[in-house]
């Protein structure tokens, strides 16, 4: 998982994109006053070029039944709890995503894509969310005793790079949702799995200043990983790194943008709100000569969370290795988000650049030493204690309008 595009210090009054013109009239009559929202922090334009640093996640899921399926314990988990490993329950993972799964009331399911162009000039993040985890509307519904996840859906799109920054996260209700095994419709946007590739047709409006984001993204996995990992002792939260190595083709009409590059797909699902199970986590991934290396270190609210260190190759095979010692990183400069990572003894980890500094989420470039290789990672820190605070909750609505229905 990860959160993305969330409330950077200037996000509430961010400069508007250049392509506003008449697109703002679309959907305008149906938007309720913008409320908070966010998902996961896109890299800002103008950061250090990051050829080969693929970060992301999203897509694919398991069989048609309820969200279930447990696995054997991961050898890399800390203590005796968390970090279990197994095959996605009720499905053939080689067949790709299933979009018709049932979700526990109060729970969530998302598919996440992150990609970077081959020249390092452009990037994107897309999250298709059912039971939007950072939605204030969903939180209010849970408090009222009506926690219907399918009434709180969104397609979060973040574009960054030379063409400028775009960010969308319009929440939609149950009437705007259509689910089939190989297709998911959220309002005017949809995701389709054809057996070999994922196609995402985007038709969304940016916030807070409206402009259109429209076009097609194709994701071609090198292979589909067959293992999933539980993140909490109760096994209610599951992470599936579906395709850590993928090719991505971007063809957008608005803004006019065409590029191809490398990407990463995963999916997260849970049977309760994230903040009920976790205090915080650090997550990172990097391309290395041996493949894609990933670290996921979770602090559970009760018991022991997962501590995972994984290597993936282009064939989709995953190898666990013992997590290196945990080290502290400097807190972020504005919102003072705590950060940490793992690094082999005798070496030092360092923050190369802070990309996003928000009230409860930070995204950074971090250099560390993993499995005998120096790696520059895209790194994320999420504080769910911060997220759950009343002050932060009041901030969230400015980036997430909701369409009724």
From Swiss-Prot:
Keywords, in A-Z order: Carotenoid biosynthesis, Chlorophyll biosynthesis, Lyase, Photosynthesis
Protein name: Acyclic carotenoid 1,2-hydratase
pH note: Optimum pH is 8. No activity is detected at pH 4.0-5.0. At higher pH values, it shows rapid decrease in activity, although 50% of the relative activity is still detected at pH 9.0. It retains much residual activity after 30 minutes incubation at pH 4.0-8.0, indicating that CrtC is stable in both slightly alkaline and acid environments.
Record's compositionally biased regions (Gly residues): 79-89
Keyword field contains Zinc: no
GO molecular function, one term: hydro-lyase activity
Source superkingdom: Bacteria
Induction (record text): Repressed by oxygen.
Enzyme class: lyase
Entry function: Involved in the biosynthesis of carotenoids spirilloxanthin. Catalyzes the hydration of lycopene to the corresponding hydroxylated carotenoids 1-HO-lycopene and 1,1'-(HO)2-lycopene. Can also act on geranylgeraniol.
Reactions mediated catalytically: rhodopin = all-trans-lycopene + H2O; 1,1'-dihydroxy-1,1',2,2'-tetrahydrolycopene = rhodopin + H2O
Ranges annotated as biased composition (Low complexity): 33-46
Annotated segments matching region Disordered: 1-47, 61-98
Its EC number(s): 4.2.1.131
Family recorded in the similarity comment: Belongs to the CrtC hydratase family.
Record field: compositional bias (Basic and acidic residues): 19-29
Transmembrane segments: none
């Amino acid at each position: 998982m990860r959160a993305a595009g969330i409330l950077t210090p200037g996000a509430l009054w961010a400069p508007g994109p250049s392509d506003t013109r008449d697109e703002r009239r679309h959907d305008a009559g149906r938007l309720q006053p913008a409320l908070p929202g966010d998902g996961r922090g896109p890299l800002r334009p103008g950061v250090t070029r990051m050829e080969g640093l693929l970060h992301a996640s999203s897509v694919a899921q398991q069989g048609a039944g309820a969200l279930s399926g447990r696995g054997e314990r991961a050898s890399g988990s800390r203590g005796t709890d968390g970090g279990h490993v197994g095959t996605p329950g009720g499905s053939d993972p080689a067949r790709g995503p299933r979009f018709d799964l049932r979700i526990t009331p109060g729970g969530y399911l998302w598919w996440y894509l992150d990609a970077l162009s081959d020249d390092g000039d452009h990037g994107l993040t897309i999250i298709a969310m059912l039971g939007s985890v950072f939605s204030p509307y969903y939180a209010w519904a849970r408090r009222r005793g009506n926690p219907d996840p399918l009434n709180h859906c969104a397609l979060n799109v973040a574009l960054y790079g030379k063409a400028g920054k775009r960010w969308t996260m319009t929440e939609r209700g149950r009437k705007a949702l259509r689910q089939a095994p190989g297709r998911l419709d959220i309002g005017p946007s949809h995701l389709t799995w054809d057996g070999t590739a994922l196609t995402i047709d985007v038709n969304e409006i940016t916030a807070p200043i409206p402009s259109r984001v429209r076009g097609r993204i194709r994701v071609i996995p090198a292979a589909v990983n067959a293992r999933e990992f539980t993140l909490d002792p109760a096994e209610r939260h599951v992470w599936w790194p579906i395709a850590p190595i993928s090719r991505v083709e971007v063809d957008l009409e608005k803004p006019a943008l065409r590029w191809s590059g490398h990407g990463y797909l995963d999916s997260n699902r849970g049977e309760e709100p994230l903040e009920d199970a976790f205090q915080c986590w650090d997550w990172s991934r990097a391309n290395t000569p041996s493949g894609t290396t990933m670290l996921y270190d979770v602090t559970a609210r009760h018991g022991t969370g997962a501590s995972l260190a994984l290597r993936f190759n282009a064939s989709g095979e995953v190898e666990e290795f013992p997590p290196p010692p945990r080290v502290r990183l400097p807190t972020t400069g504005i919102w003072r988000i705590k950060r940490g990572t793992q690094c082999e003894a005798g070496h030092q980890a360092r923050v190369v650049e802070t990309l996003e500094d928000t009230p409860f989420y930070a995204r950074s470039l971090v250099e560390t030493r993993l499995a005998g290789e120096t790696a520059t990672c895209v790194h994320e820190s999420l504080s769910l204690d911060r997220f759950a605070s009343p002050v932060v909750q009041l901030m969230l609505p400015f980036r997430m309008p909701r369409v009724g229905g």
